[in-house]
């Protein structure tokens, strides 16, 4: 039986992620883990996250799980969700007062930046709002096993003010337009991550999690 560890470092709605994974793959053993051993013993790892990046990185470091996450990213299938995707990169412009940026895990080259949409209007004449909250389309930038069974430009659910700017275009797996075209999914080797929330994205989100459970990078 495949064991999936959802990393619990005290931030994020882990229950909805766990429920979605169990619904997508009832044959898998889905565990919410808060100790390094739980990550090391798992076959696959999900790194969720929500809220402010400084708080997330501080909580991950304080939890004692950061090194285990980095170790897992070297060899195990890993899925990052929302801020969990952003944490995979080198730094974020979402920082505490008096600092320019927050150092992140550095598993993928690039940075996290904020939407700058002041004064911009949507096609219907309304102003863009930050954070983006709601459904939006994801354009698949390239084929990937996790896109299997998911039509291009399917709708997924977003809640975010920041997004990743990948340094290597080959790492971009999906893009979305919200005032600007931004990266909404990334992939490298055994890592896949999304800015949107699969657990809030109905059938297509469950299909994405189902593909992750059966993915053999």
From Swiss-Prot:
Protein origin, superkingdom: Bacteria
Enzyme Commission no: 4.3.2.10, 3.5.1.2
Catalytic activity: 5-[(5-phospho-1-deoxy-D-ribulos-1-ylimino)methylamino]-1-(5-phospho-beta-D-ribosyl)imidazole-4-carboxamide + L-glutamine = D-erythro-1-(imidazol-4-yl)glycerol 3-phosphate + 5-amino-1-(5-phospho-beta-D-ribosyl)imidazole-4-carboxamide + L-glutamate + H(+); L-glutamine + H2O = L-glutamate + NH4(+)
Pathway membership: Amino-acid biosynthesis; L-histidine biosynthesis; L-histidine from 5-phospho-alpha-D-ribose 1-diphosphate: step 5/9
InterPro entries: Class_I_gatase-like, GATASE, Imidazole-glycPsynth_HisH
Lineage summary: Bacteria, Pseudomonadati, Pseudomonadota, Betaproteobacteria, Burkholderiales
Organism: Cupriavidus pinatubonensis (strain JMP 134 / LMG 1197) (Cupriavidus necator (strain JMP 134))
HAMAP family in UniProt: HisH
Protein name per its UniProtKB record: Imidazole glycerol phosphate synthase subunit HisH
Pfam families: GATase
GO molecular-function terms, A-Z: glutaminase activity; imidazoleglycerol-phosphate synthase activity; lyase activity
Database matches in PROSITE patterns: GATASE_TYPE_1 (PS51273)
Keyword field: Amino-acid biosynthesis, Cytoplasm, Glutamine amidotransferase, Histidine biosynthesis, Hydrolase, Lyase
Biological processes, Gene Ontology terms: L-histidine biosynthetic process
Subunit-structure text: Heterodimer of HisH and HisF.
Keyword Lyase belongs to the record: yes
One cellular component term from this protein's GO annotations in UniProt: cytoplasm
Catalytic residues in the record: 82 (nucleophile), 197, 199
Residue span(s) of domain Glutamine amidotransferase type-1: 3-217
Protein's job: IGPS catalyzes the conversion of PRFAR and glutamine to IGP, AICAR and glutamate. The HisH subunit catalyzes the hydrolysis of glutamine to glutamate and ammonia as part of the synthesis of IGP and AICAR. The resulting ammonia molecule is channeled to the active site of HisF.
Gene3D superfamilies: 3.40.50.880
Localisation per UniProt entry: Cytoplasm
